Amino acid sequence: MAKKDLRHPRPALNPALILSELAQGSSNWRDIQVVGQVTSTNDIAIARLLDSPNVEVFAVTADEQINGRGRLQREWTSPYGAGIALSIAIPAALFSCSASAIPLVVGVAVNTCLLRQTANAKLKWPNDLMIIKKSGELAKAGGILVQRQQDHVIVGIGINTHLGLQELPTQFATSLALEGIELSREVLIAQIIAELEMTVKHAPEVWREKYLDMSCTLGNQVQVTNLKQETLTGLAKSVSTTGALILETAQGFVEVIAGDVARVRT
């Protein structure tokens, strides 16, 4: 049974339960470190790789993350017991996709797990985990950050599982619990690890087809701001096997490798 930290009303993660869930499946990825409070689980993973660069796959998860980062160095924190802060270090050679497609491949794996709990789980290009709220609006429930460290890829996954309304970082965010999705953090962590182990092996056309079905970006008029702060407007038509968003603009088709997407209201 998970112990409660007297300073916090929510239970701590139970490492034995995570390992038990992994053992019930066919996953070979069972090296997982569970910690209390961290600045960032990615930082813990990087430190281990610096000490042991030849290590195979391992994961780090924490009850509380106080200085996590999302894409473009945006802050991503996780209050004690209220979310999933998970980093998985994977040898880059295990991925069947190009490096630029890794965030999308990870998104497919995570969203596959969320779809077992709710039909309202979606992916927003390039790396946001979205939920269709009871109101019909889309809200962000999580995100993915991918970092390269030597011969490994560190996959950082953050999900708001049990945040209350007052704990949400913005009005455009939500948590699974607020949308009526109750689940065990331990079970979801184990499912994500096991699903990702399979998904990294998918051929590009396989994960891409799944991504197209899960996307809430495609088919909409969007405005994309790329890393050079240039703005493009067009119809989000598809994604390529390299992870690029394919836009149909007034000037023709354009592939965007990275950027921020906002839906254009009509």
Give residue spans per PLM region.
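Short loop/edge segments at beta-strand edges and connector loops
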Residues: 36, 123-125
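Long, positively charged amphipathic alpha-helical accessory segments at protein N-termini or as interdomain linkers
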Residues: 2-11, 17, 94-96, 100-121, ...
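N-terminal lobe of the biotin/lipoate ligase/transferase fold
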Residues: 1-116, 135-136
